Each structure stands twice: as structure tokens, then as C-alpha cells.
Amino acid sequence: MSELKDCPLQFHDFKSVDHMKVCPRYTAVLARSEDDGIGIEELDTLQLELETLLSSASRRLRVLEAETQILTDWQDKKGDRRILKLARDHELGAPPKHGKPKKQKLEGKTGHGPGPGPGRPKSKNVQPKIQEYEFTDDPIDVPRIPKNDAPNRFWASVEPYCADITSEEVRTLEELLKPPEDEAEHYKIPPLGKHYSQRWAQEDLLEEQKDGARAAAVADKKKGLIGPLTELDTKDVDALLKKSEAQHEQPEDGCPFGALTQRLLQALVEENIISPMEDSPIPDMSGKESGADGASTSPRNQNKPFSVPHTKSLESRIKEELIAQGLLESEDRPAEDSEDEVLAELRKRQAELKALSAHNRTKKHDLLRLAKEEVSRQELRQRVRMADNEVMDAFRKIMAARQKKRTPTKKEKDQAWKTLKERESILKLLDG
């Protein structure tokens, strides 16, 4: 019983925090359902209330740690009555007595740790123990509000968009208005090649011809006879044959010209301009002239078809020229072009690209014009700031003169009026 009476523990009464009064927002959030959630405007209040609860819990934790330390020290120095007396005095609030300590004998058992010597003063060991118990009157720590750096970050991100326009930015806009060098490449339509089935068939045919010519050459070498055709390239022979067939190919009516060329000639040449053969006199031919002309107009020559070279190229050139002059519509194209889905899609995308490029160019011109106007306005605003400084200087001079109880001079008044008029004129230019 005596040991329990001498126990230095203070047995603090921990008062719980009233959540309804101290933390109303925290209590309301706990009472909600999970679907309601927490609003953004409630975060600051919740943070302050949670910090209040944290400070209360940390204060109770410090008190419990102090009680544990007191119990440990009391167990280690159970025989020291001086320490127990000072602890009881501290509980009652009595100030410790400073003076020469009395000598005491050790009363502890052998099992405990050694205490201080019998004739040794204990004032040095007493003072730290008294400081350990001074925690009841500590004020509640006010939670420190964290620094809110969000506005600074926001204005730092917005600043480049609100800054003044520089000459380098105007120069960049002027360079963007220059047309790119490869702009014409995007509107070119590549020529339509052969269909893959025709190309593959022709390649297979040429490959077979080469194999046949190679086999024939090997056979002729074995026989010792090399034909004249094996020395020629089969590919060149095919090209020459196709060219000759194309040149000598005649339509059914025997006219080498195309339909467009015939229509053009019919539109330009009048009818019945040549007299009939019956009305024209037939001159008498004699001698060599008659022989030569007769040879030229022999029945054999009349049966020979009339041939004109390059009729196909003439037809295509006439068609292109008529389309360029506006006499022929460009829709009169072969049906294969209108049925080509790739070509139609390519032209559609080229039209979209052309419209988008024109729109971007217009917007760039507008942006360049606005940038130049803003640069001139920036110069006017700079002049306004300089005029404001001059007006403030004149105002300070006049106020200093009034404080000294003297009338401002005529020079100071004239200077003030002059700066005010200059400022008004600059503001009119800026508003205009």
C-alpha cells in the first residue's frame, strides 16, 4: 500500500474531442452514404478539422509517453526517497526547495540498480526529472496551414499567352505566309499505269520468249547453225512490231484521222469548195510527164491505203488545246477515269487540302495584321506608362511645395499641365 501511495504517476483525465462541435463537417461527411461523395469546396474545411483531430491525438500520445517514462524512472530508483518527495511536491504544485541536501542511506535491495552515494549531493539529478513533468500546462499547438501555390502556378502558365508580342514573333508569322516549295507536288496526279493483270501477263510472256530463245540458241549451237533472229533481243523485236502495227493500223472507213480531228476539219472547211470531177477538164498528158503521172496514179497505187504518221498524238493535242480554250468540256473524258475510285478519292482530298490551305492562309494574314496593330498599341501603352511617371513626379513636387507651405512656381504648374495634356493625347490615340 505504501508503494502505491508513493507512485509518481499523475493519471491524467483525457477529454475526448466533441466531433459535433469541433468537427461538424467531418461528422456530416461520415454520416453520408458512399454515393454522395465529397465536394471540392469542402476539402479546406475537412483538412483543418482533420489537423485538429491529429493535434489532439498527438498531445495525448505525448502525455502517455511521459507517464511511461516516469514509471520507468520510478522503478529504477525506487529507493531514492528524495526523488519521490520531489515528485509529490510537483504534483501538489509546491516549488522545489533549493538548498544543501541531507545525507541519506541506501534502502534499496541488492536486486535493484545502484543509487547515488550516501554523501553525494543530488541536486544535479533532480532538475531534469522536474522538467519531465512540466507538460500539463502546454498550449494546444495551432496547426500550420500549408501554403497554397496553385494560383502562382496558374498565373505562371497563363503569362506566356498574355505577354507582349515581340518582333521575332511577327517575323515568324511572315515566314509562315510564304508558300512552301513542295506545295505543287501535293496537287500532281501521277499517270495511270497498266493494270496488274496485263503487266503480269506481259512479263510472263516475255519470260517465256526469253526461255524459248535461250533454248533455241542452245539447240542451234549444238547443230552449228545460229539463226539471224537469235542475235536480236526479243524485247526490241516486240517493240518494233507493236510500233509498226500502231502506225499502219487503219480504221474501218479508211481515214487515218480521229473523230475529233474530222469534226474540226468539217467545221473549218466549207462544203462543195472543189468542183466535181465531171465538170473539170482533163488535161492531156504527153511524154515523160504523162508517164510519171501515170505511174503515180496507177490502179495499184489507188488501192494502197492512205497513211499519215502520228495521227494519235495529233488527236490528243487537238483535244487538249480545245479543252484549254474552253471549246470542249473537260467532262468528255474516257469512262475509265470516272470509274477510277482511287483517282476520285485523290481529287477529293486535293480539293479539301486546297480549301484548308486557303483558310489557313487567310487566318495567318488576319493574325499578322492583328499582331502589327498590337505592336503599335504596345508602343502607345509604353508611352502612357512614361507619361504616368512624369505626372506622378509633377504631383510629388506640388505636394512637397504645399507641405512646406509655399505656392508652387509657375514652371512647376506649366510642367504638370503639359504632362497631363500629353497623357490625354496618348490615351486618345490608344482608344482610337
Swiss-Prot record:
> Keyword Acetylation, does the record have it?
yes
Positions where N6-acetyllysine occurs in the chain: K418
Q: Would you tell me the Gene Ontology cellular component terms? A: ATAC complex; mitotic spindle; nucleus; SAGA complex; transcription factor TFTC complex
A molecular function (GO) held by this record is: nuclear receptor binding
Alphabetized Pfam families for the sequence: Ada3 (PF10198)
User: What positions does the cross-link Glycyl lysine isopeptide (Lys-Gly) (interchain with G-Cter in SUMO2) connect?
Assistant: K21, K129
**What is known about its subunit structure?**
The PCAF complex is composed of a number of TBP-associated factors (TAFS), such as TAF5, TAF5L, TAF6, TAF6L, TAF9, TAF10 and TAF12, PCAF, and also PCAF-associated factors (PAFs), such as TADA2L/ADA2, TADA3L/ADA3 and SPT3. Interacts directly with TADA2L and PCAF and also with the high-risk HPV oncoprotein E6. Component of the STAGA transcription coactivator-HAT complex, at least composed of SUPT3H, GCN5L2, TAF5L, TAF6L, SUPT7L, TADA3L, TAD1L, TAF10, TAF12, TRRAP and TAF9. Component of the TFTC-HAT complex.
Q: What does this protein do?
A: Functions as a component of the PCAF complex. The PCAF complex is capable of efficiently acetylating histones in a nucleosomal context. The PCAF complex could be considered as the human version of the yeast SAGA complex. Also known as a coactivator for p53/TP53-dependent transcriptional activation. Component of the ATAC complex, a complex with histone acetyltransferase activity on histones H3 and H4.
**Under what name is this protein listed?**
Transcriptional adapter 3
